[in-house]
């Protein structure tokens, strides 16, 4: 199996649907994109970038995807990000998440599992999933406001070696949100990043460390991409930020 390769939207649309069974309801990528595009047009939104990371079978057939749609905003530092996860082989439940991204590095920010609307591929999963795409776009402005305020507050929080070791260690040893490969990326970023401060800089902040870590999360597998970002943000929330309860998505048909 090949994991974390990039694919185009057309490749995802062209991937053949699996056969439906009594115990399985496919959620077509084509319908997901139609619903996303409908919300983008309806909201007058401008897409800055789209990225689709996929897992494939040994024969090169796409089986799972984590998609990120980056949306422009008037903010000079951050944009909005809409994410979805889907699979054609039962390896992943369908999921929707909303968050943000940092312009200069395109690192993602997912505040909580608030839009981790998860749905196994059964019953009315196809229609429910499309409703939750609508709900995600309806709530993205409110969530984005919270995220930008939180990210700005991280800039005011100094991080020393002890704090860095504690946070990175928790993500690696306790939560398994970063792998050994990603740990090395974090280490390299802390000393050699050309976008954020280094660990030995006197003004090294939680914002800098956050972005060093999320740079490594670009290597997360589609199955864990959302939860790895959630774990990272929640850890920083608990350490540095006073939070409110995240927005909730509808989880079933009315």
Whereabouts are the PLM-identified features?
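Feature for intrinsically disordered/low-complexity regulatory segments and propeptides
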Residues: 1-37, 44-51, 185-194, 198-199, ...
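A short acidic/basic microdomain associated with nuclease active sites
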Residues: 41-69
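Intrinsically disordered, low-complexity regions enriched in serine/threonine
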Residues: 52-54, 70-254
């Amino acid at each position: 199996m090949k994991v974390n390769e990039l694919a185009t939207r057309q490749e995802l649309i062209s991937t053949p649907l699996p056969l439906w069974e009594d115990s399985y309801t496919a959620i077509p990528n084509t319908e997901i994109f139609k619903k996303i595009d409908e919300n983008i047009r309806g909201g007058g939104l401008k897409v800055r970038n789209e990225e689709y990371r996929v897992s494939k079978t040994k024969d090169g057939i796409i089986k799972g995807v984590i998609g990120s749609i980056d949306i422009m905003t008037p903010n000079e530092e951050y944009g909005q990000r809409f994410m979805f996860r889907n699979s054609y082989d039962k390896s992943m439940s369908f999921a929707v998440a909303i968050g943000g991204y940092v312009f200069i590095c395109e690192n993602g920010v997912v505040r909580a599992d608030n839009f981790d609307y998860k749905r196994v591929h059964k019953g009315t999963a196809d229609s429910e999933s499309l409703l939750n795409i609508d709900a995600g776009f309806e709530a993205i402005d409110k969530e984005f406001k919270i995220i930008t305020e939180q990210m700005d507050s991280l800039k005011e929080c100094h991080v020393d070696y002890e704090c860095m070791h504690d946070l990175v260690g928790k993500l690696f040893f306790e939560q398994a949100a970063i792998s050994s490969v990603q740990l090395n990326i974090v280490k390299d970023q802390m000393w050699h990043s050309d976008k954020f401060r280094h660990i030995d800089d006197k003004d090294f902040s939680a914002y800098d460390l956050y972005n060093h870590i999320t740079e490594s999360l670009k290597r997360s597998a589609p199955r864990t991409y959302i939860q790895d970002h959630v774990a990272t943000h929640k850890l920083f929330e608990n350490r540095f930020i006073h939070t409110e309860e995240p927005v909730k998505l509808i989880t079933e048909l009315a």
